[in-house]
Structure formats: structure tokens, C-alpha cells
From Swiss-Prot:
HAMAP family: RNase_HII_B. Manganese or magnesium. Binds 1 divalent metal ion per monomer in the absence of substrate. May bind a second metal ion after substrate binding. Its cofactor is Mn(2+); Mg(2+). This is Ribonuclease HII.
Amino acid sequence: MATIKEIKAILETIVDLKDKRWQEYQTDSRAGVQKAILQRKKNIQSDLDEEARLEQMLVYEKKLYIEHINLIAGIDEVGRGPLAGPVVAAAVILPPNCKIKHLNDSKKIPKKKHQEIYQNILDQALAVGIGIQDSQCIDDINIYEATKHAMIDAVSHLSVAPEHLLIDAMVLDLSIPQTKIIKGDANSLSIAAASIVAKVTRDKIMSDYDSTYPGYAFSKNAGYGTKEHLEGLQKYGITPIHRKSFEPIKSML
């Protein structure tokens, strides 16, 4: 009779819930075997659910693949709402039908997984571009226009020319064909990839600023108006990276 350890190893090779080998092991009365069967089936179902989710997030890309358009850049930004720091945009071109496990809107992914998924994107992407507009630009032309500038810069920094742009809720002044997608980071893998790249990039920038301007907890709040950040403003005043066109900073000038 096979040991529980040996059976567990065999179960790991089964990837189909309809595999006939399940019947052989389900008659084994040992609790350890039954527990292993339940866990393996749970893992397989989880993988199937993830595959279906990723497939659904390729709907916009697949419409373009049918038209023989394969170099598709997903574009997203992070940092429109904070009181301090830049707005950061990313443009990412993934290979056709590329499915990176657990890739999703950055807001739906636990922060502890951001770096791993970010690295997977960098490893698999055909091209990645970053665009950054600082607080001075935001104050000069407003956050909406600064966001568009950052997105255009991100596209210009791609090492591969995109044939089509998938953009999260924006239309850019570019001649490249584009599709505006509401909640794009939750509905397109290309945009979700850009969301993660922009998020990790901006978080690193704000973490570095925490060393330059201590007392505002930038590494924790990324420039958003948390209690700790607002207390820092009252105690230490405005820094060069604060957005002077945003309240409450505007009223502090």
C-alpha cells in the first residue's frame, strides 16, 4: 500500500477534477489521504477559477488579436488623490494571451504581493514605460492634465511601438488607436499590469521621500491625507513635494 506521502505526490500531478484516478484514492479510508484529496481538489478548483478570471480580463485584448493587433499597451496611473508627491503612469505591453497569476487591479491585490507580481510583469512584458509628473506640474496645469501628460510620457518611453492603447478612463492626444475603458484596471490584464507597475513605482518614490522629509509618514500613506500626514503638516509645515493647489495645503499658504 502506498504511503500517504506517496499519494500526496501523485495527487499533485492531477490537474483535472474529472481524472479517473480520484476514484482509486477516494476509497482509501485513511484520514490523511482524504484530507489530501480535499485539499488538492480545492487547489485545482482555485486554479480553474483563476484561469477563468484571467481569461475574462483578456476580453478587450482578444478583440484586437482577432484583428491581428498584438502590440497592445495597457495604460494606468496612480496618485491622482494624494496631497503630496507625483502622479505616476505606466504603459505595459504584454505578449499575446499572457496570463500572470493573481494579476488584477492593484487596489484589489494585498500590498505584500505587489512586488512579486510587479517582478513577474517586468520579466514577461515586451515593453514597459513610465511617466512621472511632479507636484509643480500638478499645480501648474491641474491633476487631470498632469495625469494625461504622465500617460503620454509613459507611452513615449516604451521601447516597442504599440499598435493600440487600452486606457483606464482616459482619452489621450495621440495618433495611436485607443480604447477608453471604464474601470479598466479591473477589466483588462494589460491595464492591470500598468496599474501594478505605476503603484510599485510611486510607492518607492514616496518611501524615498519619507527619508528626505520625515514626520509625514510618506512611506505608509504614499502622500494621502491620513491623520498622521495631516498632523505632520500642522507640526512641520508644507514640503516642496506638497500640492499647493490641493486643500488643506492651499489654505495653509
